């Protein structure tokens, strides 16, 4: 049995289901490229049959990612598998992941079928997927509540049909680690052809046991772990990949396995996913939380100063968190900024140096010194705003006080035209948003607003993340500035541009569909 555990990331498929606003194709690609840098073996990037937008996103990622295997999800339905294959065919290497429920409850109440019919359908669909690729993963949905004898029958049939990976999900986060390990051991005992496939696990955190269950399964013989960065996902979330990866590294003495992950990219990838998905990481989150390497107890601090291993089982540097930070000033040149970005692990393709340096100078003039966390925030915002903008914040001014009604004046560039409006509101941010709504007539409804300090002290950058509702869809926006009202205004303008871009994408998809329809009629 191989001692390498395959890391299967589902941040962009299962993880995205937890988000209040769907990610754009550009945001998904940004995360996919970060996952590729981190070295995930397989990335599941969408459910192509669900929408034209998801199909396009999967296809875009499949075209760009070269070093990780790209995977798409498909139910045991002919159209699902055919559409998944179509979206993936541009990839260097791809996998089709198909699934069907196997527990008595799901078979009876959801599928209204029988186990024999489920097995027959699984065989047919695995064979269909094999027509497109020799890398087919089959999942037994709700395997955690499936009797082991039934599960063994399904697994044996799927392997005989050509499945190369068999995934055992604890779909509802129900099992305990010793139970889950028993399921894996039971399959090795009962399935005669099990050596012809890799056994995978996919766990959920409803009882807080997702990581524990995955590690117990690895100890019992599973050689693929599925999960999401930061543990994002439906309900209580998925297995946190960064936790499993570091547990395998730190406790190699017990597990005796390894991964192909570049551990130095863990922290940066985690931060990127948090920012793009607008899901802050709890301070006490294992591995990547801001408190993961903090020591407040005097006894602990003394022990760490004498020897870090007294209270640290891994170092911040082991996940790419460099604690030595260089500060730059307005006198620092472009070369110094580029050198620092290189030292932090950024490639030139990940940011626009001209735009970054311009933003750096403006910030340095305001706050004097610019630190690593400032540069990272500027690079992230710059990447988010690289796409063509229809709306641009030209000017804003607010007046408010303890006894005054907040008033805002806003100038907004809308294409080639600059429009201005003023409005009152319940505070300066609301006044700015009311003025912007008057200018655009979009009538955007604010659903969520959050403010995060990027840095330390009174001159820290403030990042505002908002989720807004427009025509039944939710859109995410982000803004960054030393002034909170300015950050808020930029976040709303980002939302407007995302709405505008979504409309443009929809027009393009309709144009392509009409073009294809016309070609069919011609034929």
Swiss-Prot record:
Regulatory domain as annotated region, ranges: 392-523
Pathway given in the UniProt record: Amino-acid biosynthesis; L-leucine biosynthesis; L-leucine from 3-methyl-2-oxobutanoate: step 1/4
Biological source species: Escherichia coli (strain SMS-3-5 / SECEC)
Subcellular location: Cytoplasm
Binding site for Mn(2+): 14, 202, 204, 238
Cofactor or coenzyme needed: Mn(2+)
SMART domains: LeuA_dimer (SM00917)
SUPFAM superfamilies for this protein: 2-isopropylmalate synthase LeuA, allosteric (dimerisation) domain (SSF110921), Aldolase (SSF51569)
Role description: Catalyzes the condensation of the acetyl group of acetyl-CoA with 3-methyl-2-oxobutanoate (2-ketoisovalerate) to form 3-carboxy-3-hydroxy-4-methylpentanoate (2-isopropylmalate).
Entry protein name: 2-isopropylmalate synthase
PANTHER family cross-referenced by the UniProt entry: 2-ISOPROPYLMALATE SYNTHASE 1, CHLOROPLASTIC-RELATED, HOMOCITRATE SYNTHASE-RELATED
Family: Belongs to the alpha-IPM synthase/homocitrate synthase family. LeuA type 1 subfamily.
Pfam families hit by this protein: HCS_D2, HMGL-like, LeuA_dimer
Catalytic activity: 3-methyl-2-oxobutanoate + acetyl-CoA + H2O = (2S)-2-isopropylmalate + CoA + H(+)
GO BP: any one term: L-leucine biosynthetic process
MF terms in GO: 2-isopropylmalate synthase activity; acetyl-CoA C-acetyltransferase activity; manganese ion binding
Subunit: Homodimer.
Residues annotated as domain Pyruvate carboxyltransferase: 5-267
Swiss-Prot/TrEMBL keywords: Amino-acid biosynthesis, Branched-chain amino acid biosynthesis, Cytoplasm, Leucine biosynthesis, Manganese, Metal-binding, Transferase
UniProt-listed Enzyme Commission number(s): 2.3.3.13
A GO term from the CC aspect: cytosol
């Amino acid at each position: 049995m191989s001692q390498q555990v395959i890391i299967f990331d589902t941040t962009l498929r299962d993880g995205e289901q937890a988000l209040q606003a769907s990610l754009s194709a550009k945001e998904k690609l940004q995360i996919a490229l970060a996952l590729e840098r981190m070295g995930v073996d397989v990335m599941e990037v969408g459910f192509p049959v669900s929408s034209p937008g998801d199909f396009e996103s999967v296809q875009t990622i499949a075209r760009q990612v070269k070093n990780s295997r790209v995977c798409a999800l498909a139910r045991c339905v002919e159209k699902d598998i055919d559409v998944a294959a179509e979206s993936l065919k541009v990839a260097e290497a791809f996998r089709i992941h198909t699934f069907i429920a196997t527990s008595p409850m799901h078979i009876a109440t959801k599928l209204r079928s029988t186990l024999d019919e489920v097995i027959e359908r699984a065989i047919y669909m695995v064979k269909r997927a094999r027509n497109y690729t020799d890398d087919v993963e089959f999942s037994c949905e709700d395997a955690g509540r499936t009797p082991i004898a039934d599960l063994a029958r399904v697994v044996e049939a799927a392997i005989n049909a050509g499945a190369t990976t068999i995934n055992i999900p604890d779909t509802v986060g129900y099992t305990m680690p010793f139970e889950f390990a028993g399921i894996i051991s039971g399959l090795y005992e009962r399935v005669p052809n099990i050596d012809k496939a890799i056994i995978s696990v996919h766990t959920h955190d409803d009882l807080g046991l997702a990581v524990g269950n995955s590690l117990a399964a690895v100890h019992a013989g599973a050689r693929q772990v599925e999960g999401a960065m930061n543990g994002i996902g439906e309900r209580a979330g998925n297995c946190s990949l960064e936790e499993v990866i570091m547990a395998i590294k730190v406790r190699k003495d017990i597990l005796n396995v390894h991964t192909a992950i570049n551990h130095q990219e863990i922290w940066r990838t985690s931060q990127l996913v948090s920012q793009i998905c607008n899901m802050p990481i709890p301070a006490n989150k294992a591995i990547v939380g801001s408190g993961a390497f903090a020591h407040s107890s005097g006894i602990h601090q003394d022990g760490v100063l004498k020897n870090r291993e007294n209270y640290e089982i891994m170092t911040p540097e082991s996940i790419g968190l460099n604690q030595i930070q260089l500060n730059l000033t307005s006198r620092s040149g472009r070369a110094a900024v580029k050198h620092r970005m290189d030292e932090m692990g950024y490639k030139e393709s990940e940011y626009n140096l001209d735009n970054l340096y311009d933003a750096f100078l403006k910030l340095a003039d305001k706050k004097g010194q610019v630190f690593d966390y400032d540069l990272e925030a500027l690079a992230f915002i710059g990447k988010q705003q690289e796409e063509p903008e229809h709306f641009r914040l030209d000017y804003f001014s607010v007046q408010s006080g303890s006894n005054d009604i907040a008033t805002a004046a806003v100038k907004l560039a809308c294409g080639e035209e600059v429009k201005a409006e003023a409005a009152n509101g319940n505070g300066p941010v609301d006044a700015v948003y009311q003025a912007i709504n008057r200018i655009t007539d979009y009538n955007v409804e604010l659903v969520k607003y959050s403010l995060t300090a990027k840095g330390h002290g009174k001159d820290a950058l403030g990042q505002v993340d908002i989720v807004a509702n427009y025509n039944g869809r939710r859109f995410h926006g982000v803004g960054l500035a030393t002034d909170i009202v300015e950050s808020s205004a930029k976040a709303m303008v980002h939302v407007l541009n995302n709405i505008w871009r979504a409309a443009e994408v929809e027009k393009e998809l309709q144009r392509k569909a009409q073009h294809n329809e016309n070609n069919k009629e011609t034929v």
